[in-house]
Amino acid sequence: MGMLNEFKAFAVKGNVVDMAVGIIIGAAFGKIVSSFVGDVIMPPLGLLIGGVDFSDLAITLKAAEGDVPAVVLAYGKFIQTVIDFVIVAFAIFMGVKAINKLKREEAVAPTTPPVPSAEETLLTEIRDLLKTQNQNRLP
């Protein structure tokens, strides 16, 4: 029973749950970015370059023979994947930058010093008076 309780305590910890939510949202975000790149960015880019469909760009190293498929370098798909990565990396960078900015603002937020009590004010005045009297007595 001890191992089951340990696992339950581990799985319910906030960090594990937060990580799981982050992974799920990250996977969904990755699909959105892939669709954005493949369906929105690449078609106009291909049109500008001369009607090229990037996903079809490839170099055939060996032609297909019978049941053996062709050996190709699909560099068009690689270009799409690189663009996917750049967009995801930029989005993560912007998110981290925003979080860091919020953390800095929290840390920099000045705290107002507490108002001294009447007793502290009186003691400060007495100290200042004693300093003044001692300075006047010195030759």
From Swiss-Prot:
<keyword id="KW-1003">Cell membrane</keyword>
<dbReference type="InterPro" id="IPR037673">
    <property type="entry name" value="MSC/AndL"/>
</dbReference>
<protein>
    <recommendedName>
        <fullName>Large-conductance mechanosensitive channel</fullName>
    </recommendedName>
</protein>
<feature type="transmembrane region" description="Helical">
    <location>
        <begin position="79"/>
        <end position="99"/>
    </location>
</feature>
<comment type="subunit">
    <text>Homopentamer.</text>
</comment>
<keyword id="KW-0812">Transmembrane</keyword>
<keyword id="KW-0472">Membrane</keyword>
<keyword id="KW-0813">Transport</keyword>
<feature type="transmembrane region" description="Helical">
    <location>
        <begin position="9"/>
        <end position="29"/>
    </location>
</feature>
<dbReference type="GO" id="GO:0008381">
    <property type="term" value="F:mechanosensitive monoatomic ion channel activity"/>
</dbReference>
<dbReference type="InterPro" id="IPR019823">
    <property type="entry name" value="Mechanosensitive_channel_CS"/>
</dbReference>
<comment type="similarity">
    <text>Belongs to the MscL family.</text>
</comment>
<keyword id="KW-0406">Ion transport</keyword>
<keyword id="KW-0407">Ion channel</keyword>
<dbReference type="InterPro" id="IPR001185">
    <property type="entry name" value="MS_channel"/>
</dbReference>
<keyword id="KW-0997">Cell inner membrane</keyword>
<dbReference type="Pfam" id="PF01741">
    <property type="entry name" value="MscL"/>
</dbReference>
<dbReference type="GO" id="GO:0005886">
    <property type="term" value="C:plasma membrane"/>
</dbReference>
<dbReference type="InterPro" id="IPR036019">
    <property type="entry name" value="MscL_channel"/>
</dbReference>
<comment type="function">
    <text>Channel that opens in response to stretch forces in the membrane lipid bilayer. May participate in the regulation of osmotic pressure changes within the cell.</text>
</comment>
<keyword id="KW-1133">Transmembrane helix</keyword>
